[in-house]
């Protein structure tokens, strides 16, 4: 599920809907802007566009402002310049920490806490990947090291890292236009072509991480009277089937890569180029797995319909850069399926542990959205058929 920023603007949602319309029309040429608005609302976990607009109105102006002394301390540690305005939160905390924006006399920067970061590779390694990707033509916010040369620093009881901020629009929403899908394929081929070594496949994609069985977790949700408990119980067979995708097939060699290159980690620059953010989860994946993951993230429309035009554009973009495409069979979706199963498990546990009314409201909406939008083997097979 997409997450609204802390200070959402309706103009950004309108822009997202217009960009989404291009992808929807590849699936259904009769799609309208109203269809795109409704689809976007669904991606944010709301039933209708008016409900999403009402949430934007409710949240507008609610971004948190950091203590000025903390802003100055972080800016000083990373040598960002003299603080020229309030340091404001950009979004609610995620699985790593929380993103903030700070403006100094040297420009605008995105800084984020790393308090709950579970690294797949160390920060120096992900920065090396970013710099190599940028040198190869990938557009991304340049990471900033501290005065002491560190990527992550402790300031004010939190761990921080910083990036230069690039002018760009809101996060993208799938399905996207063929041009954007092709750019995604090009970025993936560029990263894989770097062939940077890594010692393992990301655990997130390699194996199921949650200790409890799905049936046991569903029973816990029922006992806690979670509003989505029935949906989870009904989804147990689908989740178990996804976890079995490619299980008995040998794992190909991984390369160091972005690892989460979905719509939430991309923006469009003013010139239309793809901006790639969210490198903190960098790690190892076999190229075939990451391309398959991208097809699932980028080429599936609402209600599980496959965007064949977008899927072909993505692999064509990859092929133009790399000379070929590694994804060939259902087993290549193993990483995507395993990662999705782990994500569902994590979100269910977070929803059961949520304490405040606002956190429960957000978590319940997210779990309900996940459980009603799970792909199936049929979805994966249709993606393969689209790019055969």
For each predicted feature, which ranges?
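A cross-family kinase active-site recognition segment
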Residues: 174-231, 252-254, 361
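ATP-binding pocket architecture of kinase catalytic cores
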Residues: 104-199
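A glycine-centered beta->alpha junction motif in the catalytic cores
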Residues: 160-174, 217-223, 337-358
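ATP/Mg2+ or Mg2+-diphosphate-binding catalytic cores
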Residues: 221, 343-388
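Intrinsically disordered, low-complexity eukaryotic regions enriched in glycine, serine
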Residues: 1-62
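Active-site acidic catalytic loop and adjacent metal/ATP-binding pocket
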Residues: 95-105, 110-111, 143, 243-289, ...
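Active-site activation/catalytic loop segments of kinase-like enzymes and analogous catalytic loops
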Residues: 288-323, 337-355
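Conserved NTP-binding catalytic cores of kinases and kinase-like/nucleotidyltransferase enzymes
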Residues: 61-147, 270-271, 386-388
């Amino acid at each position: 599920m997409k997450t609204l920023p802390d200070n959402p603007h309706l103009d950004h949602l309108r822009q997202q809907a217009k960009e989404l319309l291009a992808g929807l029309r590849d699936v259904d040429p009769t799609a309208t802007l109203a269809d795109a608005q409704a689809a976007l609302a669904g991606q944010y976990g709301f039933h209708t566009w008016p409900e999403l607009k009402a949430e934007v109105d409710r949240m507008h102006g609610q971004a948190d402002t950091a203590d000025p002394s903390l802003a100055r301390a972080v800016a000083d540690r990373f040598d960002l310049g003299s603080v020229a305005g309030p340091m404001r939160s950009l979004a609610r905390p995620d699985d790593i920490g929380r993103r903030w924006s700070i403006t100094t006399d040297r420009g605008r920067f995105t800084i984020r806490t790393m308090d709950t970061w579970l690294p797949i590779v160390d920060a120096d390694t992900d920065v090396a990947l970013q710099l190599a990707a940028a040198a190869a033509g990938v557009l991304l916010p340049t990471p900033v090291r501290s005065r002491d040369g560190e990527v992550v620093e402790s300031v004010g009881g939190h761990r921080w890292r910083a990036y230069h901020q690039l002018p760009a629009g809101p996060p993208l929403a799938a399905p996207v236009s063929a041009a954007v899908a092709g750019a995604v394929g090009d970025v993936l081929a560029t990263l894989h072509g770097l062939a940077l070594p890594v010692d393992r496949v990301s655990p997130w994609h390699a194996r199921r991480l949650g200790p409890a069985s799905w049936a046991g977790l569903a029973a816990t949700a029922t006992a806690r009277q979670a509003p989505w408990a029935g949906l989870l119980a009904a989804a147990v067979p689908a989740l178990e089937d996804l976890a079995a995708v490619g299980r008995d097939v040998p794992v190909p060699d991984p390369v160091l890569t972005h690892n989460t290159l979905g719509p939430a980690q991309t923006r469009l620059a003013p010139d239309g180029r793809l901006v790639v953010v969210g490198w903190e989860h960098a790690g190892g994946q076999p190229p075939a797995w990451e391309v398959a993951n991208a097809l699932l993230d980028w080429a599936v429309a609402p209600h599980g319909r496959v965007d064949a035009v977008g899927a072909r554009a993505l692999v064509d973009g990859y092929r133009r850069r790399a000379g070929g495409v590694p994804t060939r069979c259902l087993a290549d979706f193993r990483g995507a399926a395993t990662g999705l199963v782990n994500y569902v498990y994590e979100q269910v546990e977070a929803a059961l542990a949520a304490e405040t009314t606002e956190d429960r409201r957000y978590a319940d909406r997210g779990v309900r959205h996940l459980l009603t939008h799970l792909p199936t083997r049929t979805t994966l097979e249709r993606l393969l058929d689209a790019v055969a």
